[in-house]
Amino acid sequence: MKKGIHPENYREVLFYDGSVQMGWIIRSCAATTKTMVWEDGKEYPFYPLDTSSASHPVYTGKRREVNTEGRASKFNERFKGMAGLAAKK
């Protein structure tokens, strides 16, 4: 192989989704300074994930409801007097 063209930090990295406490050890060049001891007792560079296939609603089939009631009631409260003005014109 040609020297000097391949990344030097290619190593096993623990990608961890904290919302479902699941992790995957994958060879990667992901830049991270954190480390974590995994189930096998070894210490790996640690890369935290916000969402993964284990927690994303598209993959899990579970729906998450967004709280829009507060936003809708704020909108209605703000513009409740406008309906009468529009009817008068």
UniProtKB/Swiss-Prot annotation:
GO terms of molecular function: structural constituent of ribosome
Family of the protein in this entry: Belongs to the bacterial ribosomal protein bL31 family. Type B subfamily.
Quaternary structure (record): Part of the 50S ribosomal subunit.
GO cellular component: a single term: ribosome
Gene3D superfamilies: Ribosomal protein L31
Keyword set includes Ribonucleoprotein: yes
HAMAP family reported in the protein's UniProt record: Ribosomal_bL31_2 (MF_00502)
InterPro entries reported for this sequence: Ribosomal_bL28/bL31-like_sf, Ribosomal_bL31, Ribosomal_bL31_B, Ribosomal_bL31_sf
Taxonomic path: Bacteria, Pseudomonadati, Pseudomonadota, Gammaproteobacteria, Pasteurellales
Highest taxon of the lineage: Bacteria
Any one GO BP annotation for this protein: translation
Pfam families from the UniProt entry: Ribosomal_L31
Protein name: Large ribosomal subunit protein bL31B
Membrane-crossing residue ranges in chain numbering: none
Record keywords, A-Z: Ribonucleoprotein, Ribosomal protein
